Design a protein with these regions (language model features):
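Membrane-cytosol interface segments
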Residues: 1-99, 328-333, 338-340
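A residue-level detector for short acidic-glycine micro-motifs
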Residues: 33-35, 167, 313-315
Length: 346
């Protein structure tokens, strides 16, 4: 199964999952041969892409080759970012924007779909939990949010740079606190919180974009005033900092830590749904949750009742999409199920 943009669909392809309009209307059932009329209909209903059947063995082989290239590039990029950080911290030299973001943008551009991006990052982040890897992930995810928001290339590059440098202040936090394998004490958390101010102070020594400095300072601020270091509310938080905040929280929650496993993406979405409206930029958070959930359409998941299913449709309750059970192809609308939800993406 693979995702194909509607403008790249060809007659004769076969749908892998049911195709729904953005409003939930069934347009074409799965296992149907796509006609020219169907393609025109998809365009009429503003359907951007559909999932079509393909050779699973061939797809797996192609993805494995692609992933191997991305994995090697990712590792090299982390090494390069480490050198850039050393330049900034110890040599008082900061690379130009294009040099800094080159690796991040190149990795981003290798992904054809958002599912590929999240699937690859989910695997890569399990092998590297360093601040450098987190910064690379935030840069990539934040750029995707910018693309979804329709921002121009100049603004996307600003976002990529802000993501890479947002946590630079952590290098001034003692390792025994930063890497502590357990819950921080109140006093230790107060020390951790200082990394935002430290980051701004470090970057303020250089002639770089103000948005990069502000993202380092404000990426833990929340729209309702519950964040730090200043307890700012919406009117004092710029868009780039708000985007970095969402990407930062998502990557942190889905990443493995020494004291816990990474959370299932749909559990993270549920957490965002619970208090996201008040804490995060309303322009980006709803779009982000819908797009992330939609990225997993066609994916196989494990439900909390132990059964395996395939996601076929995202409802207004993004954390609880509609699925078909693999055992009998019956449809289960998770938003109507109180005791069943997605436990893991397989």
């Amino acid at each position: 199964m693979r995702e194909i943009k509607v403008n790249e669909l060809k007659e004769g392809m076969t749908t892998a999952v049911d195709v729904f309009s953005p409003k939930g209307q069934l347009i074409l059932k799965r296992h149907q041969t796509v006609s020219a009329f169907d393609i025109a209909k998809f365009g009429f209903y503003n359907i951007a892409s559909v999932y079509v059947e393909g050779s699973s063995a061939q797809e797996k082989e192609e993805w494995n080759k692609k992933y191997a290239i991305i994995k090697e590039k990712y590792r090299d990029s982390i090494d390069n970012l480490h050198e850039y950080m050393n330049d900034i911290l110890y040599r008082n030299i900061i690379p130009d924007k294009n040099t800094l973001i080159r690796d991040s943008v190149e990795i981003f551009d290798r992904f054809e779909t958002s599912y590929e991006l999240f699937d690859a990052l989910q695997v890569l982040k399990q092998t590297d939990v360093s601040t450098m890897a987190h910064s690379m992930n935030v840069s990539i995810i934040a750029r995707l949010i910018g693309v979804w928001a329709g921002l121009d290339t100049e603004k996307l590059d600003e976002i990529s740079m802000a993501g890479l440098l947002h946590d630079i202040g952590k290098f001034k936090i003692p390792d025994e606190i930063l890497l502590k394998p357990g819950k921080l004490t109140k006093e230790e958390f107060e020390v951790i919180k200082k990394h935002t101010v430290y980051g701004y102070e470090i970057l303020n020594n250089f002639k770089i974009l103000e948005s990069t400095k502000r993202a380092a300072l404000l990426h833990h601020e929340k729209f309702d005033g519950s964040g730090y270091p200043f307890g700012y509310t919406a009117d004092k938080i710029d868009d780039i900092s708000a985007i970095i905040t969402i990407a930062d929280v998502y990557d942190a929650m889905t990443s493995k830590r020494c004291y816990r496993d990474g959370m299932c993406p749909f559990d993270v979405i549920e957490d965002f749904e619970y208090d996201g409206i008040s804490k995060y930029h309303p322009k980006y958070i709803g779009m982000f949750l819908k797009k992330i959930a939609s990225s997993y359409i066609g994916s196989t998941v494990l439900l909390t009742n132990g059964k395996k299913a395939k996601i076929i449709f995202v409802t207004e309750k993004y954390s609880r999409p509609t699925v078909t059970l693999l055992e009998d192809n019956s449809v289960l609308v998770l938003k109507d199920e109180k005791d069943i939800k997605i436990a893991a993406v397989l």
